[in-house]
Each structure stands twice: as structure tokens, then as C-alpha cells.
Amino acid sequence: MLLSPLALSLPGYVIQKKVSPNYPKRNFDMRTTPPIALYRFGNFLHRHGFRRTAKLLSWINRFFFSVWCPSSASIGKDFTLGYWGLGTVIHSNVKIGDRCLIAQNVTIGRNFGDKGVPVIGNDVYVGAGSVVFGEISIGDNVIIGSNSVVNKSVPANCTVVGNPFRIIKESRLETWHELKDKC
């Protein structure tokens, strides 16, 4: 069905009823839904052989929303961009899991000369201004603090901050969206 890739970008109350009851509830946010919807539709076109049209949608996303998120990137369900995703750059081969939030001015890509790109797990929060690069993996349920530089793999269930990053909390059981609901 053509609308199913776009349905992944719809507000939480729609997703919750139609896809899975375990997704965090979100209100409709006009600031982040259009860039993600453009990505989803472009990704659908890319997977079905309409690569030029998909690339055009990526450029529209870049021009109107300042988000570089190529249609060839693999991004899971309930992906969120913070503050329109302004200045966000995501490499075309990156794999991002479900229920991730990428804040503004984040770069996710490869290191100069390296061929590998990051693989990001489920329930990951990447704070504003962070840089995640190289052939690394970010485990599930990780919080990356603002302005952090991550160039080595990060285990699951932890919080990392700094440049170079350091782990400040391990064995964290709450996901980022559960912590957000407590604040």
C-alpha cells in the first residue's frame, strides 16, 4: 500500500492504533512531520526503483527543511527530528532503529577515508550538535548528550557525553521517551 510508508510519520495516536500499542504517545508536530514524511515517501520510491524521484525528494527536504536525509538511508519506525531537524545530516547508508530521536545540528556519517557508517539501535536519543561517525554501532536504549563526538561503538543501555565521549551511566533501564514523560 502506498500510504504505509507515510503512516510511519503520522502522529503517535494514529500509529498506536494501527501499528503497535507499544509506541510512545506523541502529539502531532507540524515541525517534524513534513521532513520525515518526505523521507518516508522518498524511501518507498527508492526501494521500488524510482531513484531519481527519490533523490529529488531528498533535495526538496534539504531546501525547505535544512535536513539532509537521503532516501537510501534505512530508518526505523517512529523516527523523530527535533526542532525541524535543522542542520541535520544523515549519511545515505546509515541504519537507524525504531523510536529514535535525532535533535537539530546532528551529523551521522562516515569518517574521512573510512567506508563504514554507524548502525544505530532502537530507542536512541542523539542530542543537539552531536557527531556520530565511523564504522561503529550504537546499542539499543542509548542517550547521547548534546555536542558529543562519538567515534567508537557504544554498548546498550547507557548514557554518553563529551568530546571525546565517556559513559556516565550504565545499565539504564528507562528509554529516552519514558524519561521525557517524567520531566
What does each of the following model-derived ranges do?
Residues 64, 85, 115:
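Short coil/loop residues immediately preceding or within conserved phosphate-binding loops
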Residues 70-71, 76-77, 82-83, 91-92, ...:
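Left-handed beta-helix
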Residues 1-67, 165, 171-183:
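Terminal amphipathic alpha-helical/low-complexity segments used for targeting or macromolecular assembly
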Residues 111-112, 169:
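Active-site-proximal flexible loops/turns
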